[in-house]
């Protein structure tokens, strides 16, 4: 039994003791129905990528501001001195939602970590959807989100305070696909929430970009409404519902399978606790 499987079993037991505090990521209005699409734009043009960064949500911990935690758009950020890690967080299909901001605040207040979440929905006419839609549309979205991540990593080079050797790439749901596909050099670790790293209705194929020994933390509900075997949209795929298969043999990987049915889980106490242990181990000065 590999290390990843041992950790998975231990963390599953932990997850079963906690209460369910999260809700489904994408809120569907009464007028929406499966397959609905609004907007058309998914092109990763320079202007579109700039818009995602311009409206990004940046959160700086008090330790970097010498005052108190700061939150806002990058252009309004206060001066920061010294060097510090940075978490680049890709939101899900509902945008920079309250759950995303809450997670960033937790990173700042509890972990002392700065984070930035580019806003994909800042793109004018950006296509949004109610699953399921065609895999071609999903793949265009994943291409855009990966371009947003690459742009964010490049744009963050303007911040002299970022320790480029301690950049964490994170994503939740839709954003986790791009977070897992990034194959560039700037990744000290990954946080993959609510995505299973495997072939299913949401992708043509996983196209994973992390290395065989790169630190990766994956957390997902056992009965996730989108990516678990219980979703009928996955009936043509041999899904397990988590990233354990993709991470098997990786000595620096942790997979937390939560005993729950909800999709958005990054703010659950058990998930936060496991995330804290993981980040503390990989971001040692």
Regions found by a protein language model. Give the residues of each.
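An N-terminal hydrophobic leader/cap segment in hydrolases
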Residues: 2, 20, 24-76
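Bacterial N-terminal signal peptides that target proteins for export
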Residues: 2-16
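Serine-hydrolase catalytic machinery in alpha/beta-hydrolase-like enzymes
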Residues: 51-162
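Loop/turn elements at helix/coil->beta-strand transitions in domains of secreted/extracellular proteins
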Residues: 83-86, 111-114, 164-166, 186-190, ...
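Alpha/beta-hydrolase active-site loop signature
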Residues: 94, 121-124, 197, 224, ...
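Primarily recognizes the serine-hydrolase "nucleophile elbow" in alpha/beta-hydrolase
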Residues: 154-210
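The feature captures the conserved acid-bearing segment of alpha/beta-hydrolase catalytic domains
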Residues: 189-257
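C-terminal catalytic histidine-bearing segment of alpha/beta-hydrolase fold enzymes
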Residues: 248-285
């Amino acid at each position: 039994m590999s290390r990843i499987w041992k950790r998975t079993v231990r963390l599953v037991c932990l997850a079963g003791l906690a209460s369910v505090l999260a809700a489904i990521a994408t809120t569907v209005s009464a007028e929406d129905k499966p397959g609905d699409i609004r907007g058309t734009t998914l092109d990763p043009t320079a202007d579109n990528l700039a818009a995602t960064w311009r409206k990004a949500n940046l959160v700086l911990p008090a330790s970097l501001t010498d005052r108190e935690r700061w939150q806002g758009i990058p252009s309004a950020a206060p001066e920061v001195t010294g060097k510090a890690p940075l978490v680049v967080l890709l939101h899900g299909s509902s945008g920079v939602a309250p759950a995303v901001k809450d997670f960033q605040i937790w990173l700042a207040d509890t972990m002392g970590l700065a984070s930035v979440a580019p806003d994909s929905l800042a793109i004018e006419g950006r296509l949004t959807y109610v699953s399921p839609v065609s895999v071609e549309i999903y793949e265009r979205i994943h291409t855009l989100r990966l371009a947003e991540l690459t742009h964010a990593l490049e744009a963050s080079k303007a911040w002299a305070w970022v320790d480029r050797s301690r950049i964490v790439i994170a994503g939740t749901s839709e954003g986790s696909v791009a977070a897992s596909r990034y194959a560039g050099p700037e990744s000290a670790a990954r946080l993959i929430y609510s995505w299973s790293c495997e072939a299913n209705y949401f992708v043509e194929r996983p196209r994973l970009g992390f290395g065989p020994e790169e630190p990766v933390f994956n957390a997902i509900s056992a009965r996730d409404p989108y990516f678990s075997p219980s979703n009928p949209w996955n009936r043509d795929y041999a899904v397990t519902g988590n990233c354990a298969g993709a991470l098997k043999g990786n000595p620096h990987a942790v997979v937390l399978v939560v005993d729950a049915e909800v999709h958005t889980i990054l703010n659950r106490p058990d998930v936060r606790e496991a995330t804290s242990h993981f980040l503390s181990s990989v971001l040692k000065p």
